[in-house]
UniProtKB/Swiss-Prot annotation:
This is Large ribosomal subunit protein bL31. The keyword Metal-binding does not apply. The gene is rpmE. Part of the 50S ribosomal subunit. It holds the Pfam family Ribosomal_L31. It comes from Prochlorococcus marinus subsp. pastoris (strain CCMP1986 / NIES-2087 / MED4). GO terms for molecular function: rRNA binding; structural constituent of ribosome. Belongs to the bacterial ribosomal protein bL31 family. Type A subfamily.
Amino acid sequence: MPKSEIHPKWYPDAKVICNGEVVMTTGSTKPELHVDVWSGNHPFFTGTQKILDTEGRVDRFMKKYGMGSADSATSKETKESKKSDK
């Protein structure tokens, strides 16, 4: 039997609230949980995910440190390897 004065009060039907609307109930140590995002409005779960066209990590690194683009670096390496093969 747990000690009665050291454990927090358990609410088996705690309400999860998102944008002023009760979206689900769960067990918690608080009677209400206010959340900004839940699976019902998150883009990944709703299928409205936007795909952003961003630079790759290697391209950003090359650009940041002034090494040109990743394509030019790899093309230089292939040209040098072809010269050494001859």
